[in-house]
Amino acid sequence: MGKLGAYVEISRPKNALMSILGTLTGWVNSTSVYDGRLILACLIPPLVLMAGNAINDYYDAEIDAINKPYRPIPSGRISKREALNIYIALSLFGIALSIFLGFIEFLIVTAFSLSWYAYARWLKRTGVPGNALVSLGVAFTLIFGSLAAGNLTNKVIIFSSVAFTSNLIREFVKAVEDLPGDRAHGVRTIAVRIGVKRTGILVFLLSLATVVLTILPVIFRLTGIIYLSLSVIISLPILMLASAICLKGKLEERARETSSLIKVSMFLGLLGMLLDPFRVV
């Protein structure tokens, strides 16, 4: 696909799709009304996220040359300037659309558009603060959808907390996966600072916290059989399998496998949250 394929790759469409699902999840768990605001709300997060991915690749070009030489910039398929232009264009488009949703939504979108620049240029190299910002961005897709629907619910707040801890786990595992390039360029990730073994223990503890948060909606009877089946019974064992790899001290050699397990767990968990309002029992 050439240049167009590189543009698509740098925007990471799979992540963009997840942001749409997150926004939709926040909406359907807050209201039963489906109108034009829903379409608008689902368009904005992927625009901002794709912009963030582009600026991230812009500043990560040298590191990616070691860790991921197949990425669009180090492979020479697009230039750094083109990546910067993508960030600017998509950010401005997302901010412009948010004006039609309301002032709070406009502030959130503007804040995250600027935050992704700050993350790519400075925060990513600080380790945990950068990981926390990325995870907050994932969690806020649900909150954004709920706010756009006009009714931020307790259930969505719990769901967004689960999204935050789950993604933080994935960020820590990715830090282990990217360890060679990060060490070479002085990036102070959690894995560089405390080592792979301690990072694995931290991932396990965060997994336990995620389990507790995931079960809370069931305890408070906020959810039904779909959430229980997908988000609890199926998703959580996969997460704990990934965390068991970390606890056994095998994270460094199985980082990619662990990351894949976490992504599957996150998707199933989110799917349960999304479909739960449509339960029949």
Curated annotation (Swiss-Prot):
User: What GO annotations for molecular function exist for this entry?
Assistant: geranylgeranylglycerol-phosphate geranylgeranyltransferase activity; magnesium ion binding
EC number(s) per UniProt? 2.5.1.42
Q: Which organism is it from?
A: Korarchaeum cryptofilum (strain OPF8)
Q: What is this protein called?
A: Digeranylgeranylglyceryl phosphate synthase
- What parts of the sequence cross the membrane? 88-108, 132-152, 200-220, 225-245, 261-281
Query: What Pfam family does this protein match (any one)?
Result: UbiA
Enzyme class (EC, first level): transferase
Identify the pathway: Membrane lipid metabolism; glycerophospholipid metabolism
